[in-house]
């Protein structure tokens, strides 16, 4: 019988960009500026499998493992970014195969989010109809075509290319700041980029004031350059970090009581990160 890790170690089929659109990324002056990022050094296969060993070694109970992923060539056709959203959400069953014992969760379209930098998709807490509580985003994400954005754009000698690289990061950083989310991600037809955000300390002469998050749409918190890790769609095998495994573990982090922004975080280990 397959374990959860066995299923999540399978590769994610790469979408087929037959008529993929080109052009600039969206922009808003209200977004937080991003000009740098830094490697998320402890987001590794070794740390994740150690931290979540009990979950990952459990028997797979999500039905036919072959249903996780995409099989038909037509399903892989991605002419624009909107078409990439359902492709990315096909991985959502990997985020819902265990009961976290708290509130229901769902990985779905970002139209549920309501702020100046709404994500394309994300992990949401789903309240019961009787509770009348709002739908809270725990993990904001953006979809981008590799014809418009890829991580290596940061290394370009052209300022215009580096500026385009920064725009999606500014958008998801702003969404994270407004929603008080510690984690986020960007997913393209070629790779998943996981992100962790950290608040910047402001001295007494700084201008930061008020609440750290503002649902009215004004960002009242400053962030350090985001930490990132890149996982390619072609990655597979239990010794490697795959897109499915990375999404699964990121959802565990965001829903396990370690989802709020802070000024620093403990190393990724079983002692500090348990669902």
Could you tell me what each predicted segment is?
Residues 1-166, 198-275:
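Eukaryotic intrinsically disordered, low-complexity regulatory regions enriched in Ser/Thr and Pro
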Residues 161-201:
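Internal, well-ordered interaction modules that form the hydrophobic cores of assembly/scaffold domains
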């Amino acid at each position: 019988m397959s374990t959860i890790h066995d299923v999540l170690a399978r590769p994610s089929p790469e979408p087929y960009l037959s008529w993929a659109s080109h052009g600039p990324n969206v922009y808003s002056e209200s977004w937080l500026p991003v000009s740098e990022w830094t490697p998320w050094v402890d987001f590794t296969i070794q740390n994740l499998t150690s931290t979540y060993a009990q979950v990952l070694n459990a028997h797979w109970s999500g039905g036919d493992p072959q249903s996780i992923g995409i099989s038909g060539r037509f399903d892989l056709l991605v002419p624009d970014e909107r078409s990439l959203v359902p492709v990315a959400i096909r991985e959502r069953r990997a985020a819902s195969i265990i009961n976290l014992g708290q509130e229901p969760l769902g990985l779905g379209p970002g139209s549920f989010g309501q702020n100046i930098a709404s994500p394309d998709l994300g992990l949401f807490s789903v309240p019961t109809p009787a509770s009348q509580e709002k739908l809270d985003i725990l993990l904001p994400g953006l979809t981008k075509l590799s014809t418009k954005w890829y991580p290596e754009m940061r290394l370009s000698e052209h300022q215009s290319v580096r500026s385009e690289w920064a725009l999606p990061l500014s958008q998801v950083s702003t969404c994270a700041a407004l929603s008080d989310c510690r984690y986020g991600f960007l997913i393209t037809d070629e790779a998943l980029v996981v992100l962790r955000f950290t608040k910047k300390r402001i001295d007494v002469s700084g201008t930061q004031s008020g609440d750290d998050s503002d649902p009215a749409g004004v960002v009242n918190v400053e962030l350090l350059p985001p930490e990132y890790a890149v996982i390619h769609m072609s990655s597979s095998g239990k010794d490697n970090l795959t897109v499915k495994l990375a999404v699964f573990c990121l959802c565990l982090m965001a829903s396990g009581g370690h989802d709020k922004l802070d000024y620093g975080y403990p190393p990724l280990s079983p002692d500090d990160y348990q669902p």
